[in-house]
């Protein structure tokens, strides 16, 4: 089995061995923790997979809808986490479809992170102090 370092991010498709749209049951033999979210605006199930250091969000039927990388995210042999956002735009010739500012509590302190959506690529990039902090991977076509 290949690991995230070998496979990385395939936009609109997968991260490592985890495929968008697939059922989470395929992955539950791996070490993980599970959380349930039932908010007023959404509900989902979140799994954190320790080896890959990723969070996987699922619909109530178990279908993977989002993969979240906060420690490591390989894309075209480059780790996006910690990369300067301006370098990301230049290196991959990308421009966001939309952007927003969201206040996030990190380690008890607030950060106003810039959130950029790249809808055609199924990517949402969270940036603080011009460095990529989190990448959300989704399939806009699902």
Residue ranges: model-predicted function:
Residues 12-17, 73-78:
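Short, recurring structural edge motifs at helix starts
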Residues 19-63, 79-134, 138-141:
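A cross-family detector of function-defining hotspots
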Residues 67-70:
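Helix-adjacent hinge/juxtasegments
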Residues 1-10:
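Short acidic N-proximal helix/loop "leader" segments that mark the beginning
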């Amino acid at each position: 089995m290949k690991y995230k370092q070998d496979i990385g991010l395939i936009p609109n498709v997968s991260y490592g061995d985890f495929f968008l749209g697939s059922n989470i049951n395929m992955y539950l033999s791996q070490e993980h923790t599970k959380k349930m979210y039932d908010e007023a605006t959404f509900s989902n199930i979140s799994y954190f997979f320790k080896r890959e250091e990723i969070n996987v969000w699922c619909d109530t039927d178990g279908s993977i809808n989002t993969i979240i990388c906060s420690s490591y995210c390989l894309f075209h042999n480059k780790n996006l986490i910690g990369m300067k956002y301006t370098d990301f735009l230049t290196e991959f010739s990308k421009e966001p479809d939309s952007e927003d500012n969201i206040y996030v509590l990190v380690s008890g302190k607030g950060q106003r992170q810039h959130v950029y959506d790249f809808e055609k690529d199924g990517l949402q990039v969270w940036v603080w102090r011009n460095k990529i902090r989190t990448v959300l991977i989704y399939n806009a076509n699902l």
